[in-house]
Amino acid sequence: MAWVTKDSTETYNQTPEPPREYTKKEKAANWWHYHWMAVVVAVLVVVFGVWIIKDTVFQTRPDVQVAYVGTSDLPTDTVTALQDALTPFCSDLNGDGKVVVQVDSYTVDFDAANENTDAYYQMAGVTRLSAELSSGGKTYIFLLEDPEGFETQTGALQYLDGTVPDDPETTDADWREMVYRWTDCPVLTGLDLGGYEGLTLMDDVTGTNQSVLAHLYVGRRGVWDEKQIPTYEGCAELWDTLTAGAVSTAAE
């Protein structure tokens, strides 16, 4: 058998093909393919950082929080007027250079026999109220539609003389000795609150804001943990101011 070999002097055309020139669109697509995860992470970090800065620097934090607890919300005009009227009685407790009073509404019906209660709003109201009454809650002053139901269910109030029941879960606390009627308090009834237009966003009923608040009772949070007393010192001063000259008629 004979072997066929190539002449060692034979030459080949080894000129390589010129490299391909990618378009800008192809280059961008290639870069995105390998770096999209890093871009997403960077964007999330920036967004989170902006949110933190906004929350810590620009968010308005109330110096005083007042809670209204009733079966229906207060008119928006009433809430705004009350916040504005209480502001001159308060000071900058959180040191942010502003004095802000915030009235929070909790829609709760303590009458278990009421079949007209909206279960969704009831659950939402109870959940929010329970959270606020926890050890981290800031609310000290309460405007109550049903003080008996509130105290029976929460055991959160203190007596008007500043004492608290030995056991916050006691069932025999006399709520009548824990609250004033709004109309018992000369300072509160003397507030210039103006009027409201519409009990809700869906009607055009008008009236005075004092008439909306006249049927409410005013109570304050009981503090059993001495470590929490400094938390409510500023609010306690506000309570003393608002109830100055008041004589309770809750037992009548």
Located regions from the model:
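Short, polar/charged alpha-helical segment
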Residues: T76-K98
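Short, well-ordered beta-strand elements
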Residues: D63-S72
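N-terminal intrinsically disordered, acidic low-complexity segments at the extreme N-terminus
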Residues: M1-P19
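Acidic, glycine-anchored loop motifs typical of Ca2+
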Residues: D92-A119
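Cytosolic juxtamembrane amphipathic/interface segments immediately preceding
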Residues: E21-N30
